[in-house]
Amino acid sequence: MKATWNGSTIAESDDTVVVEGNHYFPASSLKREYVTFSNHRSSCPWKGQAHYYSLMVDGELNENAVWYYPQPSEAAREIKDRVAFWKGVQVS
């Protein structure tokens, strides 16, 4: 699987976990040169608190396009140390 945005590969791995239709990639597959810090947080009733990264590719910013659960609930333990994408990031 590959995650792309603005013409660049953001992450690539054959080891993804699908939860609620989203592919969670290993955090180690994320190309850190495209990642910027975000203070954004959200909460899921069964997964826990999500943290976010933004993407910066060729001068274009995609805020909060990457999310992860640093301490997922026991029910969501399979997504620990994994990241998922939205906001126009194509996963195929």
Regions found by a protein language model. Give the residues of each.
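Terminal leader/tail segments of proteins
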Residues: 1-92
